[in-house]
Curated annotation (Swiss-Prot):
Protein name as catalogued: Elongation factor Ts
Cellular component, GO annotation: cytoplasm
Gene: tsf
Similarity comment: family membership: Belongs to the EF-Ts family.
Cysteines joined through disulfide linkages: none
Protein's organism: Orientia tsutsugamushi (strain Boryong)
Length: 309
């Protein structure tokens, strides 16, 4: 079957014009190389008379002129990437406007290199100013990619998890599109005087649990009093609509606060693997089996594109 072709009229001499044939495969090739929209690729190839390299320059020139407006557009899609190096792990989120860009191989490589840089730079300002292997800063490279792709791209969040004593940094990627790259990224610092390979399976399972339950806090002690008070106010307002006696309402509020902690505190959550054993008990059972105290000292979970309050 003959490939479809686009016939483009391009002025060459005065009012004369000649037809430049641009194949669909050429448009797709430019799209794969840049991540730009099909329409933009077609227009760029039209202006460049079918020359791929010139078309990339056209895309950059056109999109640079529109850069200010692009940076104001919402970027709701994204990917998260993680990196682990001995006693430290890092996660970064890069947001785009469409999920197509998230599948762009060049942007995926950029995200993975940015995650490696995040092992050293623990805040967005330093990370954006850090230099990539190309010699460009991360911020500069992203500006260039915006110019080519034509979408707003943002490095939006960064997280680090560190070990203090012996242990491992366990990791998990959900909906992976490439190694250490996907839609949900989790890091867990698991400490104990145990051979690292014996902690690996436990750490992986806990990381998967975190991806499924997205806890907000590690322990009940870490929940701010302001959060508890806010939840109590909500529960109190709900309970009073029942018209029940004050003592009954107090018991209802206590029960709802306990349930809130069970849902949001990692150590209080029921392990997703069996649905009943608390994570704190999972650690205790593992400690008995391995002959050493095992504790979670930190964790982080980022979901690509989530709305952060």
């Amino acid at each position: 079957m003959k490939e479809k072709e686009l016939v483009v009229n391009t002025k060459t001499n005065g009012s004369k014009s000649e037809d430049v044939i641009i194949s669909i495969s050429l448009v797709k090739k430019l799209r794969d190389a840049t991540g730009a929209a099909m329409t933009s690729c077609k227009q760029a190839l039209q202006e460049a008379k079918g020359d791929i390299e010139e078309a990339i320059k056209v895309l950059r020139k056109t999109n640079l002129a529109q850069m200010s407006s692009k940076l104001q557009r919402k970027a709701d899609e994204g990917i998260v990437a993680l990196a682990v190096d001995n006693n430290k792990g890092a996660i970064i989120e890069i947001k785009f406007e469409t999920d197509f860009v998230a599948r762009n191989e060049r942007l995926q490589k950029l995200a993975m290199e940015a995650a490696q840089l995040a092992l050293v730079h623990d805040n967005l300002t330093d990370l954006k100013n850090a230099k990539l292997s190309s010699g460009e800063t991360l911020e500069s490279q992203i500006s260039q990619d915006i110019a080519v792709i034509g979408e707003n791209i943002q490095v939006s969040r960064i997280r680090q998890v560190k070990l203090v004593d012996n242990g491992i940094i366990a990791s998990y990627i959900h909906n992976s599109v490439a190694p250490n790259l996907g839609q949900i990224a989790v890091l867990v610092a698991l400490e104990g005087n145990v051979e690292s390979d014996k902690l690996t399976k436990l750490g992986k399972n806990i990381a998967m649990h975190i991806a499924a339950t997205n806890p907000r806090f590690l322990s009940s002690n870490e929940v701010p009093e302001s959060v508890i008070m806010q939840e109590k106010e909500i529960f109190t307002a709900q309970a009073r609509t029942t018209g029940k006696p004050e003592k009954v309402i107090e018991k209802m509020i206590e029960g709802r606060v306990s349930k809130f902690l069970e849902e949001t505190v990692l150590l209080e959550q029921a392990f997703v693997i069996d649905g009943k054993t608390k994570i704190s008990e999972v650690l205790s059972n593992a400690a008995k089996e391995l002959g050493s105290e095992i504790k979670i000292t930190g964790f982080s979970c980022l979901k690509a594109g989530e709305v952060v309050e």
